[in-house]
Amino acid sequence: MISFYELITKIQKRPALYLGKESISNLQVFLDGYTFARRELKVPISNEEEDFEDFQEWIEKKYNLQDTQSWTKIILFYSVDERDALERFFELFDEFVKRNSSTTTEKVKQKSVVGK
């Protein structure tokens, strides 16, 4: 089975195949269905899925918002339309993943220095 982040990368390459049309709202519905299916099948949450749960808070900080709107609605608000919002999501997602990678790398470095 492919990882959660690999799935998002596949969606980015061929959004119409997975979403029907290029739309951030369709992406949200797809991801909600994916999450629901995994829960129904009692598949444990992966590290990437757990990490993605922080995306909402990260988006709020990125746009300097403390809002009750979903990340989907926030990105859509700052976009021209659904298609533009989807493209913007993938840019933000890449930034989110890279930020987390550097944060994780820093934590590992700190642990190795402390352990010496």
Predicted regions and their residues:
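Short, solvent-exposed secondary-structure capping/transition elements
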Residues: G20, I24, R39-N47, T68, ...
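Short alpha-helix boundary/capping elements
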Residues: D32-R39, I59-T68, E82-R83, S101
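Short, charged early-sequence alpha-helical segments and their helix-coil boundaries
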Residues: K42-L76
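Residue-level detector of well-ordered alpha-helical segments, enriched
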Residues: S3, L7, N26, D51, ...
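Amphipathic alpha-helical binding modules
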Residues: T68-K116
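Short, charged/polar micro-motifs that form catalytic or ligand-binding hotspots
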Residues: K13-I24, I45, I75-R83
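Short terminal alpha-helical segments
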Residues: M1-F36
